[in-house]
Structures are given as C-alpha cells and as structure tokens.
A protein has these predicted regions:
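N-terminal intrinsically disordered, cationic/polar leader segments
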Residues: 1-53, 57, 69-98
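Well-ordered alpha/beta subsegment
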Residues: 61, 65-69
Length: 98
C-alpha cells in the first residue's frame, strides 16, 4: 500500500499511473514523444493501436468500479490518443530513400 493512504486511495493512484503509463507508451509509438531507448521520435502505429486497445479494454473491464476522476481521465486519454492516432494514420509513410 502507498504510505499513509487508504487502500482505496492507493488503488486510485495506481489506476491513474497505469493509464498515464499506457498513454506515454502510445505517444512514443505515435512518434509524438521521443523514444528514450533510441533518443528519436519513431512511429509504430500497430504498437500505438495496441496501447489504445488496451486502454479501451481496461475501461470496459473497470466500468462501474472507478471514481468519477478515474472515469474522466481514461475517457479523455482514450479520446486524445484516438485523435492523435487518426492524425498519424492519415499521414503518408516516410518516402523510401532514393
């Protein structure tokens, strides 16, 4: 348990951290954030989609069992990632080297 917090509050913090973790992974896969392993922005749309799908699954599985704050957060993150994914998917792939 997180020091000094009730189990309920600690779990709320863990849920929020998990949502932000998947959001960050998706943003790296979308090329919106620099990949800390390569120090470059790289697009991997299938990975981004997997992270978004995982968040959608988490939302469905936790329905009715999260606070209003948690629900608003996951809804907003999924919406934001979905819009960013659509934006990136609409862009042409990098041109092949000549």
């Amino acid at each position: 348990m997180v020091e000094g917090l009730s189990e309920e509050k600690a779990n709320e913090l863990r849920f929020i951290e998990l949502v932000y973790y998947f959001q960050q992974l998706a943003m790296v896969a979308l090329g919106k954030l620099v990949n800390p392993g390569t120090n470059q922005a790289e697009r991997h749309l299938p990975q981004a989609k997997a992270m978004i799908d995982t968040l959608r699954m988490l939302k469905a599985k936790s329905k009715g069992n999260v606070s209003d704050t948690e629900q608003k957060l996951i809804d907003q993150v999924i919406l934001n990632l979905g819009l960013n994914y659509a934006d990136e998917a609409a862009k042409p792939s990098a041109a092949p080297p000549t």
